[in-house]
């Protein structure tokens, strides 16, 4: 059974439509209006082996905040919907990803309890047209709307482009592991019996 979800969200600030296939091949069709953000989402899809269609119209004449944050909200909702009842999946995933001088850690728990721990200090205000402070806002929105515990930590800092890209790719690899089926897991991986 294909684990796929489509979610739309329309406000006065943004109009977003996302389709996510957790069992895809890494194909992406992206249009957020922020080139560097599209590049990061493309890396997320490719390295997580997710198929991701993401069409966003946002109030970029104001700034990128609503576009990035609301995309995170909708992506998180799509992840939650696509994962479904969580039967038979690993639930946990982690990855440490190198990118040249940079080393990023990401750990995911699809617990149903939202939480973000984000440890990274950027040294420039923007990479391309993306405000670096919005990277944390994006992951916060994803974690809370997906109901996931998400830890992202920069173990070795360097070029800000590399840092952000390493985070998105580490998140992709960790999430791919968390949503993967494990033949040893019967039912839901929790002593409570539900997540």
Question: Which residue stretches match the model-derived regions?
Answer:
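N-terminal intrinsically disordered, cationic/polar leader segments
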Residues: 1-195
């Amino acid at each position: 059974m294909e684990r796929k979800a489509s979610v739309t969200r329309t406000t006065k600030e943004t109009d977003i439509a996302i389709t996510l296939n957790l069992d895809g091949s890494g194909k992406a069709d992206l249009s957020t209006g922020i080139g560097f953000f599209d590049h990061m989402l493309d890396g997320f899809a490719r390295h997580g082996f997710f198929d991701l269609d993401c069409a966003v119209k946002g109030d970029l004449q104001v700034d990128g905040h609503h576009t990035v944050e609301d995309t995170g909200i909708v992506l998180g909702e799509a992840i939650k919907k696509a994962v479904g009842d969580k039967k038979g999946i690993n639930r946990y995933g982690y990855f440490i990803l190198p990118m040249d001088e940079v080393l990023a850690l990401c750990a995911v728990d699809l617990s149903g309890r939202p939480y973000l721990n984000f440890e990274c200090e950027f040294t420039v205000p923007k990479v391309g047209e993306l405000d670096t402070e919005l990277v944390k806002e994006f992951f916060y929105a994803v974690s809370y709307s997906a109901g996931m515990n998400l830890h992202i930590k920069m173990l070795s800092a360097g070029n800000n482009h590399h840092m952000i890209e390493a985070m998105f790719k580490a998140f992709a690899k960790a999430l791919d592991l968390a949503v993967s089926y494990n033949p040893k897991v019967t039912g839901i991986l929790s002593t409570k019996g539900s997540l």
